[in-house]
Amino acid sequence: MATRLCCQLDPSRDVLCLRPVGAESRGRPLSGPLGTLSSPSPSAVPADHGAHLSLRGLPVCAFSSAGPCALRFTSARCMETTVNAHQILPKVLHKRTLGLPAMSTTDLEAYFKDCVFKDWEELGEEIRLKVFVLGGCRHKLVCAPAPCNFFTSA
């Protein structure tokens, strides 16, 4: 099972952040199935940090104490992406980009929790959960997600 992450929307930067649950922002080590991972400072993420997490499709910034870069998610079970998510998420993101009223922070966090983290945390399907970068992430080429076979059980 992957380290538990908290989904938070940062309205000041207008990005969705995943923060390790219980970890302090100053880089407290995280205990996970792969041993102890230290959270780097928000200012710099070493190029090799988290490279072993590439099998999960997570970019190396995923375990930063500042949270990863803006992300979009694809769940093999829900087939939810920013393109086909019932037209809800694309419209919300577009409105937020334009500075228009959109889905509340609470509703957006609940959306990601319901669509993504339920499968990941409760059903243990982290292998079939793919995380793709929306844009502007300098780490996206370090851990490119592997192709997903939707018919292979986790």
Curated annotation (Swiss-Prot):
Keywords: Activation of host NF-kappa-B by virus, Activator, Apoptosis, Host cytoplasm, Host G2/M cell cycle arrest by virus, Host mitochondrion, Host nucleus, Host-virus interaction, Modulation of host cell cycle by virus, Transcription, Transcription regulation. Residues 68-117 are annotated as: Mitochondrial targeting sequence. Pfam families: X. Belongs to the orthohepadnavirus protein X family. A fraction may be phosphorylated in insect cells and HepG2 cells, a human hepatoblastoma cell line. Phosphorylated in vitro by host protein kinase C or mitogen-activated protein kinase. N-acetylated in insect cells. GO terms for biological process: DNA-templated transcription; symbiont-mediated activation of host NF-kappaB cascade; symbiont-mediated arrest of host cell cycle during G2/M transition; viral genome replication. The keyword Membrane does not apply. The keyword Chloroplast does not apply. GO terms for cellular component: host cell mitochondrion; host cell nucleus. It is found in: Host cytoplasm; Host nucleus; Host mitochondrion. Its main location: host cell. InterPro entries: Transactivation_prot_X. This is Protein X. Multifunctional protein that plays a role in silencing host antiviral defenses and promoting viral transcription. Does not seem to be essential for HBV infection. May be directly involved in development of cirrhosis and liver cancer (hepatocellular carcinoma). Most of cytosolic activities involve modulation of cytosolic calcium. The effect on apoptosis is controversial depending on the cell types in which the studies have been conducted. May induce apoptosis by localizing in mitochondria and causing loss of mitochondrial membrane potential. May form homodimer. May interact with host CEBPA, CFLAR, CREB1, DDB1, E4F1, HBXIP, HSPD1/HSP60, NFKBIA, POLR2E and SMAD4. Interacts with host SMC5-SMC6 complex and induces its degradation. Interacts with host TRPC4AP; leading to prevent ubiquitination of TRPC4AP. Interacts with host PLSCR1; this interaction promotes ubiquitination and degradation of HBx and impairs HBx-mediated cell proliferation.
